Amino acid sequence: MKFVEIRDLQVTYMGKDKPSIVVDKLDIEEGESVLITGRSGSGKSTLVSVINGVIPHLINAEIKGEVRVFGFDVKSTPIHEISKYVGTLLQDPDTQAFNYTIIDEVAFGVENYMISRDEMIERVEESMKIYGISHLRDREINTLSGGELQRTILASVLAMRPKALILDEPTSNIDPQGTREILELVKTFRSEGISLVLVEHKIERVLPFVDRIIVVEEGKIAVDVRKDEIVDKADFLYSLGLEIPDYMLFLKKNGFRKIDYEYLRKTYTYRPPSRIGGKGEALYASVKVKTKNGIYLINTKISLKQGTITALMGKNGSGKTTLLKVIVGLIDKKRLIVEEEKVIVNGVDLSKTKLVERGKFIAYLPQFFDVMFIKRTVEDEIKFSMKNRGTYDEKRLGEVLKMFSLDAYRKEDPLVLSMGQRRRVAMASVLAGGAKVILMDEPTSGQDWYHRQILGKELLELRDKGYTILVVTHDSRFVDRFADYLLVMNEGKIVLEGKPEEVFIKSLRHGIEPPLEYELGGLIKNEHFS
């Protein structure tokens, strides 16, 4: 039996004139693992939403053609029946959590299956153990980091024992260690015969764990190949804006059709890009934050040089987001004790200022940015932000829309856009305000390589105009390409700092993986990757 059978599919959202995706034929065999990739907004999420029944049962859209999952007609089968066979991890795990604590969330789906209490407990305990969250069982959902929340939702899905899993960017919000753990689980799922669809931008990372690669471009399947053919298609995939590493292009140029690591280690060289040093101190912060029980979550100092891009990396739960929230004045002082909060921006002491005043000096983009949207159109959202900060004019609005490739979406509701597009709306809104120091929490999460490069180039332009930027990210290739400095945080402290190539040499001990080019190009010896 096939996992997926699609024939003559067209999906058109309400209010749209043309289909968002058109697929003449697509088959996925039972037990097969498939990577679906493509640029943000290309139609990937629409395709998987048809496979799991979200379209048309939860999202109102017109479907033409035939879609079958394990033999069931998706259009006529209730979604609760489809969910018994197909489990899904959504792109933004925050939208998938409904309960107060972790154990309640993991048990929620299984409870609806009306199985015995003993079996339910067994499934819940097994799932929490597999995902490493057993010790967090009584934690409140709203206190979890992005990675912890993602593991919780995955555990909830796994507890329902589906025949197939759809993982919509499962590594987008987690650190390298978490990525390795999830991919090891993918390996386990494959060995157990579970059918898998992974929607991912990180082609390089998931390649060993899939059988096929499907590329969606402008609502159509542009490429459908076995994974062994990826080097042969490297140039074309790169032209589509996908994250094809430099060493794959090097192999293609030298006549290879498959990846040959032995050849690469003998012949491939890599040199990091040039960086600037910066002059003067744009931001200094000394922060100490502890729980009501006296456990320090943050105990560190941070300094950003004027007119530079600094990346902040670290494991999930290391304190990166908490540090940013203290600096911008968003920390919950009823839940946590702020022992020290010294913040100086461009010589101005903001330590005792309120949130509104601090916001004139520091712009902040949170990790889960959908909560920022309060207007019905992209244009009005950015306009509202600019007016609040006294920076609005029509010409500037147009420039911001074009800068973030949003001009074509100016009349769209931000909440109906893809995650990558929504993130660009949030970034445009924050950066349109005029603050000279910008803190961004995971702006690369969920973005394809094409738009990450656009983001990086925009940050370089802002840097060259005198802006100082701090970017929290797990994306080491983005850091290597665009950051001037790299800070590594562990257990609430900055433990490494310097230029990325200096820090990457020492970063593995703190769970930070350099781009593979560093090892293949001889910048880091093989034993560092053991």
From Swiss-Prot:
Sequence positions that bind ATP 2: 314-321
Protein EC: 7.-.-.-
GO cellular component, one term: plasma membrane
Membrane topology: Peripheral membrane protein
Binding positions for ATP 1 per the UniProt entry: 38-45
Compartments in which it is found: Cell membrane
Enzyme type, top EC level: translocase
GO MF: ATP binding; ATP hydrolysis activity; transmembrane transporter activity
Keywords (A to Z) from UniProt: ATP-binding, Cell membrane, Membrane, Nucleotide-binding, Repeat, Translocase, Transport
Biological processes, Gene Ontology terms: transmembrane transport
Residue stretches making up the ABC transporter domain: 6-243, 282-516
General function of this protein: Probably part of an ABC transporter complex. Responsible for energy coupling to the transport system.
Family statement: Belongs to the ABC transporter superfamily.
Protein name: Putative ABC transporter ATP-binding protein SSO2030
Species per Swiss-Prot/TrEMBL record: Saccharolobus solfataricus (strain ATCC 35092 / DSM 1617 / JCM 11322 / P2) (Sulfolobus solfataricus)
